[in-house]
């Protein structure tokens, strides 16, 4: 099976992310806690380079807590990376994201911290943004591609958050990852294309 769903707005978003990243202090990458590996976009990781990164495992209330702890331990061993887990209905865990960003960047010159939030479609970025901003800024939904353009949001006096559209990579050749992304709603059903092998 090969999954090919890379609509025009995703290509545009990728170019905009590449252009904006040099001006960003930290990247907040939102992953689905149920499938952290499959929901991690390798294209975004390559673009991020050695930029500070906060890995947020969203929807942790739906995931295996022991597996979540293992993933957090893994992230916290990486250079310039920290992990945290948040639950959709647990507002305080989401608000911790701002504190972690401030701690990781450690900005002492009084300038604003510029953070960029990234992730594949439908992992919960918009819900997190709305909580951090204390108001409804981003549209939420159970279908992918709700957010289709960048928007800048002040979430505190010293942190600005740049919201980006959910972006997949052009071709997903790992069948298991593709199925998992489809199950959590990151890919539209019509995007599933079965490619027969010579033995079919």
Q: What are these model-predicted stretches?
A:
Residues 1-27, 33-54, 60, 66, ...:
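Helix-rich effector regions associated with P-loop NTPase G domains
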Residues 32, 75, 128, 163-164:
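Residue-level signature of catalytic and energy-coupling elements of molecular machines
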Residues 54-55, 116:
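A structural signal for isolated positions on well-ordered beta-strands in alpha/beta enzyme cores
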Residues 63-118:
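Canonical P-loop GTPase G-domain recognition
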Residues 112, 135, 150:
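Short coil/loop residues immediately preceding or within conserved phosphate-binding loops
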Residues 115-134:
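Glycine-rich phosphate-binding P-loop
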Residues 134-142:
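Post-Walker A helix-loop "phosphate-sensing" segment adjacent to the P-loop in P-loop NTPases
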């Amino acid at each position: 099976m090969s999954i090919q769903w890379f609509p025009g707005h995703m290509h545009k978003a990728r170019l905009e992310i590449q252009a904006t990243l040099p001006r960003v202090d930290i990247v907040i990458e939102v992953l689905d806690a149920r499938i952290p590996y499959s929901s991690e976009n390798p294209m975004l990781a390559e673009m991020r380079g050695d930029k500070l990164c906060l890995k947020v495992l969203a929807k942790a209330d739906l995931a295996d807590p022991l597996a979540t702890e293992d993933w957090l331990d893994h992230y916290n061993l990486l250079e310039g990376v920290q992990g945290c887990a948040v639950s959709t209905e647990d507002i305080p865990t989401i608000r911790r994201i701002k504190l972690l960003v401030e701690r990781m960047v450690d900005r002492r010159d009084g300038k604003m911290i510029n953070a960029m939030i990234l992730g594949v479609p439908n992992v919960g970025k918009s819900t997190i943004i709305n909580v951090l901003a204390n108001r409804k800024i981003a549209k939420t939904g159970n279908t992918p591609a709700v957010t289709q353009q960048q928007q800048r949001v002040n979430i505190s006096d010293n942190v600005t958050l740049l919201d980006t559209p959910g972006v997949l990579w052009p071709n997903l050749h790992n069948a298991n990852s593709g199925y998992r992304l489809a199950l959590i709603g990151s890919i539209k059903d019509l995007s599933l294309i079965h490619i027969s092998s010579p033995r079919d």
